[in-house]
């Protein structure tokens, strides 16, 4: 029965890809509209594909170098699993492929969404949302397909005769974890590079176009407007997709490894197998129910932003309610130990995700008081807008942090049978909560990818000179997109926190494998006891490595981890500043030298701005990304396992809170500007509007570059630590 249930995993992944193809074909049948709309969409598509081509060249070089390094470690020094180089490549390939397919769909969907909005609001919403669903379903489909492929392959090729049955599953799951580093590395380049690109273009377009020249957003007279629209795709579609692909795979793989570890001492291999496949089955059922939720999203004509939010919320909530019922059914069919309470841990994960999403919506949507007050602060100039936005961002961290803390404790206690000493099952519960939060990713990512599609549709309508009624509809879709994008960032950050914690626990399992590979059969405890490495518990490893707050290596690692979050943000913020500076200079040059741009008599050189953003993003993304990869390796070689654990704890705790602050402050600044543009506090062109545009410009790298990139930093450092565990155990200095 259990083996039969497992086949639901590859079947669900293939079904997700089939529906993604169906939604893509349906979208492509729609008309792109007028010749001008087609021309604009083609320019955006060309710029986006040109950027991805350049990015993948650089990422390919980095991957080649890392594969050579992993091959030397695996086949030369034997401190790493022999499957790591290949697993690393497949993780990166599928992550990149999901971003490419999602972005290609988004660039074809924007003009079709704008054209559909000429007929009705519901038509525009349907095309934009179902095109976003292509991204969501491709991510979960490819992710789960990769996981099921590797499980079946490793189960067939890893010999059972050299291992006890329970140890074989531990080796399989820890080996599978390593392809997560490929996904993480690709995701970091996609997020950082895409974030730098989109914000360099956005800041350049806003500062010179809106503030200096006084022309509206997406005005065809602005030379940076095509680059700005390209940026929405490379940052918020390809970047977000790679980010959540990594979280999705990471949470499932980490939980499977923790499930194998929880039953490593048991003679019951059947129960261990059930614990390993449970997170995969929950994810598989989540795919099926996400598809149902996607089909349920529709709205009425003349809907307000709240009505549109309600439409998307209905689809997401429907999927969430159904996944709760389905989880209880699946785990009952599995007859997993303590299945009722483990099912409740899935509910905890979903609730944490909902709380974080609603909290983000409250603090960033112009429908609520915090953002409205932020708009009002513009009466006294841009300085108070920036001060108020920073304060709002800091206050907004409270609810998500408390929600995650409650989620960690609740899921730990539920899975462990309310026994804090049952660490193995407790950590498995935290992993299950992370899987629960991401189980409806098919539809939640659809709402995220919808945002940039709607934004591009609005830009297309503005540049093509469509009527006021069409602009009103695309503005409504765009305004909703800003909120769903902000909510999506909060969701991504929350999932990164739980996934990061599950990966942190999985690191100990990788240390066990590393010690075994080096021939360390027994562990000598500080109290004189000797424990078999193969049978050591999490607590035994903590005692063996003296992982306590009074250990200077742990403290040093924690400080370094906290520093990494700020160092990384500083590097990415400065990168945006430098790239935006080049863009500002170019836009000013074109206004100055190309006569007739502002009167509409001459067309700007859009391609030059696209090339500047592309070049700037490629140049600036390498250093932050390499530092994120090298930090865990250097810490491990100097301070050993203890220092790495401190680094991961410090990076997780500080990075999580800092990411929420930056994402919410940036989202609030963006929507404060939108609230003024709706006609409040003097409307467009007034002094309050100019002040909120400055706030929005400051917030751009907060919410679209540094904040979201921290999610990946948290997970990538854990993944690098896991992959390099053998190196740390073998060659650490202290």
Swiss-Prot record:
HAMAP family named among the record's database cross-references: PPase_energized_pump
Primary role: Sodium pump that utilizes the energy of pyrophosphate hydrolysis as the driving force for Na(+) movement across the membrane.
UniProt site (Determinant of potassium dependence): 485
Transmembrane regions listed in the UniProt entry: 3-23, 58-78, 82-102, 134-154, 169-189, 244-264, 275-295, 314-334, 336-356, 377-397, 398-418, 423-443, 491-511, 557-577, 629-649, 650-670, 712-732
Compartments, as annotated in UniProt: Cell inner membrane
InterPro entries with a match to the protein in the record: PPase-energised_H-pump
Site (Important for ion transport): 191, 236, 243, 704, 715
Binding-site list for Mg(2+) 2: 229, 232, 455
EC number in record: 7.2.3.1
Reaction catalysed by this enzyme: Na(+)(in) + diphosphate + H2O = Na(+)(out) + 2 phosphate + H(+)
Family per similarity comment: Belongs to the H(+)-translocating pyrophosphatase (TC 3.A.10) family. K(+)-stimulated subfamily.
Recorded GO CC terms: plasma membrane
Membrane-topology descriptor: Multi-pass membrane protein
Name recorded for this polypeptide: Putative K(+)-stimulated pyrophosphate-energized sodium pump
Top EC class of this enzyme: translocase
Protein keywords: Calcium, Cell inner membrane, Cell membrane, Ion transport, Magnesium, Membrane, Metal-binding, Potassium, Sodium, Sodium transport, Translocase, Transmembrane, Transmembrane helix, Transport
Regulation of its function: Requires K(+) for maximal activity.
Binding-site positions, Ca(2+): 670, 696, 700
Assembly, per entry: Homodimer.
Positions that bind substrate: 199, 703
Single GO BP term: sodium ion transport
